[in-house]
A protein has these predicted regions:
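Gram-negative outer-membrane beta-barrel transporters
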Residues: 327-330, 390, 495-504, 522-606, ...
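Face-selective signature of the C-terminal outer-membrane beta-barrel domain
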Residues: 222-230, 265-412, 437, 490, ...
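Conserved C-terminal beta-signal and adjacent last beta-strands/turns
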Residues: 215-216, 228, 384, 446, ...
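Short acidic/polar hinge/loop motifs at secondary-structure boundaries
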Residues: 89, 97-98, 105-131, 473
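N-terminal periplasmic accessory domains that precede
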Residues: 58-61, 81-85, 98-102, 115-117, ...
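Transmembrane beta-barrel wall of Gram-negative outer-membrane proteins
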Residues: 158-160, 165-194, 199-237, 263-284, ...
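Surface-exposed extracellular loop regions of Gram-negative outer-membrane beta-barrel proteins
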Residues: 233-247, 349-360, 404-413, 422, ...
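Membrane-embedded beta-barrel scaffold of Gram-negative outer-membrane proteins
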Residues: 276-278, 284-302, 437, 443-449, ...
């Protein structure tokens, strides 16, 4: 894509030239150096994603990104909890508040719900993370954008195999093949991951396929096809623990998890196509379409047989989704100075058949819920960048979004009325920014904007008993963002970033109650997030490499509501977080020795701030070797996580009604891996 964009946008190459050592980004929808983007944006490269890492969870590689907190639940039934500047911390499963994208195709549903497990890290070329108000140009995402880009196939057809195993009967095997055949470039990755889990009743299996093909249809047109598939059968859910249970035995599970055999099965398939066509040297048109299906069966930690309005303790969800987008990109001039413009329209739709059954101790029983749900999203955006002076550029953008929810109830019996209903949410979200180039390697920037985030269908799914049906009383949250920052990239030396931000959100969507795998939500009043993000990376060509990320985030409720006092901190959000990584390579022997350190401040587990998960520091060590010939390469690694055997809480279940807030992280554990590649 970068090579194509370079040709298509050649008219302004001189004006928008990339500085040495700079980073080209695509999360703003337009390829350009990060020094020219008035926003916080970071990239994690393939080597950083895969070298000495299991390539299963985003928590392995996103710790190095300031402003991002990834809480690894060690619970593959509920996926990671990812938050950006505190957005998404309310999620009891999956990802919310952050737009997930894979190869330009949405990995989030139209309602904003996303699953990090659908990303294939084994074939990722890079991960781009955008934070701040420019994410509003993607619509239903107030916190940011995570964009995973699959690598292209190598110039020479190459077969790559990987295998690792370690503690808790964990193993992963992968097979990847790719290459260039005339006008076609393709790559595919197939993997299986299995683990018994650190905790009892936490076994998981994940089979994953990711494929990408790119076909040049002449000099001006390129077609990209992508497909992904995920199978995750009978993934056990250990649920959370109380503080007393953690102190007694952090690996245990509560009796309800065994009694009701809490577990989840996921089947996810998705495919998409993007056609990129140069209308002229200065203008290109991009059209995308995608479609997919998702099946979920979840056994929760209760029967759900009573009262009459109960929805059961087994969720059966059959979903189809799809959409399309048309985008125009143009480079021209205004007042004799470069002007870059983009605009587009996007349409998405998701339809699901949701049923609920009584959980008869791990076996689905009588039907207690039956409904069809549809959510559709339409949006239009426009964005412009104008270099109005030699060292100044201004950025303006706006998006109009409408998200419509509709539910048709088919389970209408005595004591359980017709709960059909519908609700629409809409917003226009502007954003503006300015960049000043202090010198060729340093830029100062500022931005302001508005954000918009609707409830997801999962958040609308339940009301507190005895009420039934969807919770259409939930409103969308709306936010105002302001940020200033500095970036400097010195080729062959270092990369430094700093950002200060202030965010005020009204009608914040918060957890009301969470119990047995079921969660209800409500709107709070106003919240405020103020923070500082710092990033540093050495870009030396010698044997040493190092990087660090620091986040300070004061996220609190400005207004009291219910039993929650004004000034309480948002649950699931650490006030400070620090990550550091250093490595040394010895080229003659292929040896690499690395160390990672993560410090995370204490985290509130509920809105009333009555309990906290303690702060912790964890150290990991990695040892690797590499051998290679003219057509082959071999890599081995030994990874020791939590070297000091620290007891800590990896994630929390926000506002759990039973006080089971805590999800303990593993003790010291080891992985040994081998990777081989062969060119043909």
């Amino acid at each position: 894509m970068r090579a194509l964009a370079g040709c298509l946008l050649a008219v302004s190459c001189a004006s928008f030239a990339q500085q040495p050592g700079d980073v080209v980004v695509t999360a703003t929808r337009v390829d350009q150096p990060s020094l020219e983007v008035p926003a916080s944006i970071d990239r994690v490269y393939a080597e950083e994603i895969r070298e000495g890492r299991p390539q299963v969870n985003l928590s392995e590689s996103l710790g190095r990104v300031p402003g991002i907190t990834v809480l690894n639940r060690q619970n593959y039934a509920q996926d990671l909890q990812i938050s950006s500047r505190g957005f998404g911390s309310r999620s009891t499963f999956g990802v919310r508040g952050i737009r997930m994208i894979a190869d330009g195709i949405p990995a989030s549903m139209p309602d904003g719900q996303g699953q990090a497990s659908t990303f294939d890290l084994g074939s990722a070329e890079r991960i781009e993370v955008l934070r701040g108000p420019f994410s509003s140009l993607y619509g239903n995402a107030a916190g940011g954008v995570i964009n995973v880009i699959t690598e292209d196939g190598p110039a020479v057809p190459t077969l790559e195999m990987g295998l690792y195993g370690g503690s808790y009967d964990t193993w992963r095997g992968a097979l990847k093949f790719g290459g260039q055949w005339g006008a076609l470039n393709a790559v595919g990755n197939l993997s299986r991951f299995e683990t018994d889990g650190y905790r009892d009743h936490s076994a998981a299996q994940r089979d994953q396929l990711n494929a990408k093909g790119r076909l040049a249809l002449g000099d001006a047109t390129r077609l990209t096809l992508v497909a992904t598939s995920l199978r995750q059968p009978d993934t056990q859910d250990p649920l959370g623990l109380t503080a007393a249970q953690v102190a007694q035995n952090p690996r245990q599970v509560v009796p309800q998890a065994i009694q009701f055999d809490t577990r989840k099965t996921i089947e996810h398939d998705q495919a998409g196509a993007t056609l990129d066509h140069a209308l002229s040297d200065a203008t290109r048109l991009q059209a995308s379409a995608w479609a997919g299906s998702r099946f979920v069966e979840q056994f929760q930690a209760f029967s759900g047989a009573t009262p009459a309005t109960a929805s059961g303790g087994v969720v059966n969800l059959d979903r189809t989704f799809g959409g399309g987008a048309l985008r125009l990109f143009n480079d021209s001039a205004l007042g004799g100075r470069p002007l870059r413009f983009s605009a587009g329209v996007e349409v998405e739709r998701m339809a699901e058949h949701r049923q609920g059954f009584v959980n008869n101790n791990g076996v689905a029983g009588a039907l207690r819920r039956d409904e069809d749900n549809v959510v559709s999203s339409t949006g239009a955006f426009a964005q412009a960048e104008w270099k109005f002076a030699d060292r100044w550029s201004g950025h303006l953008g706006v998006r109009s979004t409408r998200v419509a929810f509709e539910s048709t109830d088919h389970y209408i019996v005595a004591g359980n009325p017709d709960d059909s209903g519908s609700k629409d949410y809409s917003a226009t979200t502007p954003v503006a920014g300015v960049v000043f180039r202090l010198d060729p390697a340093t830029s100062l920037y500022a931005n302001v904007g508005r954000g918009f985030e609707t409830p997801t269908f999962v958040e609308l799914a339940y009301q507190n008993p005895p009420a039934s049906g969807l919770n259409f009383a939930l409103e969308a949250s709306r936010s105002r963002h302001a940020e200033i920052g500095v970036k400097t990239i010195r080729a062959g030396a270092y990369r430094l970033t700093a950002a200060l931000f202030d965010i005020v959100t009204s009608d914040e969507i918060v957890v009301d109650q969470a119990s047995g795998g079921r969660t209800t939500y409500r709107n709070a009043g106003e919240t405020q997030r103020r923070g500082l993000e710092l990033g540093a990376e050495l870009l030396l060509t010698g044997p040493f490499e190092a990087r660090a990320a620091y986040t300070y985030l004061n996220a609190e409720f400005s207004d009291a509501f219910g039993a929650v006092a004004a000034g309480n901190v948002l649950p699931g959000v650490p006030k400070t977080q620090f990550y550091a990584e250093a490595a040394w390579r010895h080229a003659p022997t292929g040896l690499r020795v690395g160390a990672e350190l993560l410090y995370r401040d204490r985290v509130a587990v509920n809105d009333v701030n009555s309990e906290f998960a303690d702060a912790f520091t964890v150290v990991n060590l990695v040892f690797g070797f590499q051998q290679q010939g003219s057509k082959w390469r071999l890599n081995e690694f030994l990874r020791v996580d939590n070297v000091t055997d620290t007891a800590y809480i990896g994630s929390v279940v926000v506002n759990d009604a039973n006080g089971r807030y805590y999800e303990p992280a593993p003790q010291r554990n080891i992985l040994v891996g081998l990777q081989a590649s062969l060119q043909f």
